């Protein structure tokens, strides 16, 4: 991890030491909020399950991008150095199906969707992962891992297929809070199944269809649940245990449960100390699904309302709660973001017209309040309240006839730091001499009640983003 940690700048180590600040997270494994204790002091290793790249990302896929990017930013604000890895599943039956339907190769499908996914990530102002492994580039390690499980008798081979023996590990079902007997009752029993147990899952699938590889058992491809275990091991330099494993609530079972089972079987570790899951996205109170015809692509929503507004909307609810998206929620997000950015813009303009440098000092107490909310299991609703409180104070300073620019700078810089932790884009307005002259002409026209000319100047100022 060293190279990433050396490269990465972080906001301020001040907060990690002052008053014993620490992060608290809801751990899905223990079902309670726990104090975060890193494996390596001052460092965070985090893996987030990425997409299966067969179709454009919808807004449900976009929510974890924002949630875990915000978690990373919060750790950085607390002084930690973070390595975040997020994969691409570029081997899957769905990818093969799309490739056949479109008459193109699987690689052409996956490259197109990976680009779209990264475009959406950047539009949401999310940092790129420190590593983004692909299944196709990890195949030798995947085959070696499956072979290890077979040799340890945690997996078995039937006619070229390889299955994981769930009964060989203890505590299966703990992450999803399910008992194995209950899972057995609900398991689908196929009379033609080659499995010893209905809960056993595929590690290697024998097939001649689509993209495939040679293996000791057959020509085929790996099962989904195996891929992430191997990529974690590879990307974190052979460490079988990382700090945080994240993903959507829908991945808890069976995907994450099966990852844990394999890791315990191979390495006697549970992959991660903290399991973090974000809630699902609903549309007008209904689950998003193709059958209901209410799937919204992330790129369409970004084009409609902008990446900043969508990010703000995602963060307006606690990350573990379901998020209901409708027109009312979108309008609220727009208004709230405008409520924050408008006084910032006014402050930049007034400071620029006065020739004042707002410097770097910020309202430490206000930022402390904000950070206290963020380190409490990413309590973004409380963090928003802290922002609105500072914005209220900023508005009061901006409206003064004789502006206290020291106070203005403290409030502006505090809000900027808060937005940076949330990943909300903000650019300071720097006025040129031409801008200042245009502003003076507008004020003069207003004073002389030449409203036609004033409207002309005002339109130009709005176009420049000054008003």
Predicted feature residues:
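N-terminal, positively charged nucleic-acid-binding surface of large information/translation enzymes
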Residues: 30-35, 39-125
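Short, small-residue-biased leader/transition segments that mark boundaries at the very start
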Residues: 1-5
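Short phosphate-binding/catalytic loops that engage adenosine nucleotides
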Residues: 80, 154, 466
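N-terminal, positively charged, Ser/Thr/Ala/Gly-biased leader segments
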Residues: 119-147, 151-153
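Structural preference for alpha-helix termini/caps and helix-kink/transition segments
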Residues: 287-288, 296-467
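Alpha-helical recognition segments enriched in aromatics with Gly/Pro capping
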Residues: 23-54, 69, 140-350
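Short hydrophobic alpha-helical segments enriched in small aliphatic residues
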Residues: 11-13
């Amino acid at each position: 991890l060293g190279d990433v940690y050396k490269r990465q700048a972080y906001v301020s180590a001040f907060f990690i030491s002052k008053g014993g600040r620490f992060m608290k997270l809801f751990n899905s494994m223990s079902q309670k909020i726990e104090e975060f204790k890193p494996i390596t002091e001052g460092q965070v290793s985090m893996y987030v399950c990425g997409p299966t790249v067969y179709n454009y990302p919808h807004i449900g896929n976009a929510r974890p991008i924002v949630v875990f990017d915000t978690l990373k930013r919060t750790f950085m604000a607390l002084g930690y150095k973070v390595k975040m890895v997020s994969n691409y599943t570029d081997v899957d039956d769905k990818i093969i199906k799309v490739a056949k339907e479109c008459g193109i190769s699987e690689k052409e499908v996956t490259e197109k969707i990976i680009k779209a996914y990264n475009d959406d990530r950047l539009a949401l102002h999310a940092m790129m992962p420190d590593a983004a492994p692909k299944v196709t580039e990890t195949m030798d390690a995947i085959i070696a891992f499956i072979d290890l499980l077979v040799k340890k008798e945690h997996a078995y081979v039937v006619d070229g297929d390889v299955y994981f023996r769930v009964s060989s590990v203890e505590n299966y079902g703990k992450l999803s809070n399910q008992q194995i007997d209950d899972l057995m009752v609900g398991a689908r029993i196929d009379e033609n199944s080659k499995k010893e147990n209905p809960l056993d899952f595929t590690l290697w699938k024998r097939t001649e269809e689509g993209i495939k590889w040679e293996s000791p058992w057959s020509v085929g491809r790996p099962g989904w649940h195996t891929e992430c275990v191997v990529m974690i091991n590879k990307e974190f330099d052979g460490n079988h245990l990382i700090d945080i494993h994240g993903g959507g609530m829908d991945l808890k079972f069976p995907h994450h449960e099966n990852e844990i089972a394999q890791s315990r079987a191979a390495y006697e570790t549970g992959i991660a100390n903290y399991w973090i899951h974000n809630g699902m996205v609903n549309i007008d109170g209904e689950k998003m699904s193709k059958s209901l015809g209410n799937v919204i692509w992330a790129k369409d929503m970004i084009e409609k309302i902008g990446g900043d507004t969508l990010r703000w909307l995602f963060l307006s609810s606690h990350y573990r709660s379901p998020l209901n998206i409708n027109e009312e929620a979108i309008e609220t997000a727009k208004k709230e973001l405008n409520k924050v950015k408008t006084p910032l813009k006014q402050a930049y303009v007034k400071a620029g017209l006065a020739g004042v440098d707002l410097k770097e000092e910020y309202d430490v107490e206000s930022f402390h309040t904000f950070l206290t909310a963020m380190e409490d299991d990413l309590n973004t609703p409380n963090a928003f309240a802290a922002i609105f409180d500072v914005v209220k104070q900023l508005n009061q300073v901006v409206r003064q006839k004789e502006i206290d620019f020291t106070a203005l700078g403290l409030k502006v810089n505090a809000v900027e730091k808060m937005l940076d932790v949330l990943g909300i884009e903000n650019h300071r307005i720097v006025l040129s001499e031409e801008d200042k002259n245009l502003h003076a002409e507008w004020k003069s026209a207003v004073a002389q009640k030449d409203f036609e000319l004033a409207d002309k100047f005002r339109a130009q100022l709005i176009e420049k983003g000054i008003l």
